[in-house]
Amino acid sequence: MSKRLEAEVWSLDNCAGCGLCVAACSKQVLEWEPGTLHPVLQKRTKLLGLSRTPLDSCSFCTQLCVESCPRLERWAEMEPRLVTAARARGPVFSGAPNDVIRAILAAGRSSGLLDGVVMLDLDPWTLQPVARVVTTVEQIVETMGPQYLWAPVFDALNEAVFTHHMQNVAVVGTPCAAQAIRKLRQSTNPRLRPYQESIRLSIAIFCTGIYKPEMIEEVLVKRMNVSRDQVKRIKAHDLLEVAEGLGNFLAG
């Protein structure tokens, strides 16, 4: 872990929460812990005789976490090339906010332009957001997509790149995640080349705020007395109220 990352991002509560630093860490010493707002460094020790000595896991490191962190970059505003409105048709057609994205991904997968997609899904039993790799049109259609709840989408990136050996991966996430991919593509570090060569498409959803999964328990279960198995989809109607913990969620 770079001292710069700790000083300029984590200590200032400026972490995007995308998880790319965790995925890219060559020593795999960064991890997420429950309730934390940023990754933490694993504490490792080595036993020498009867003495246990703490190890500096980041010594002689290429600092891939710094190379991939979007919060260490000042981003200039990008001029849009095209502004348009669209509706989903075909296998994806329900009018939900993420359906246009899923229709694009389904078309890309069916045409062979994409090998798979790294995206967020919602566990139907726990209502917890999870990052997953989807590889078929059927999986893309069935995946809920982002539900305004935070989870590090890049948790599933290594599975796509190194387990499935995908060469044409799409990543769907928040604008922060898209900025992380831009930072990744700008890097000249050869250790990041497998990611650069595998990510073909990056899609950022419109984002006016994303919320902790604990809000499900606080708002739906405790305040509204709605059991988790009654919820099919989550929609945020008044983002200000949601941010204050008084969210108006619809249980369908």
Describe each model-derived feature in a short phrase.
Residues 4, 14, 58, 97:
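Charged, low-complexity surface patches
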Residues 14-17, 21, 30, 61, ...:
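General structural feature for long, well-ordered alpha-helical segments within catalytic domains
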Residues 10, 20-43, 51-54, 58, ...:
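Iron-sulfur cluster-binding cysteine motifs and their immediate structural context
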Residues 5-24, 103:
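N-terminal basic/disordered segments at the start of proteins
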Residues 46:
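DHp/HisKA histidine-phosphotransfer helix
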Residues 70-252:
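Iron-sulfur-associated redox domains of electron-transfer enzymes in respiratory
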Residues 5-7, 50-51, 90:
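A short, structure-level motif marking secondary-structure boundaries and short turns
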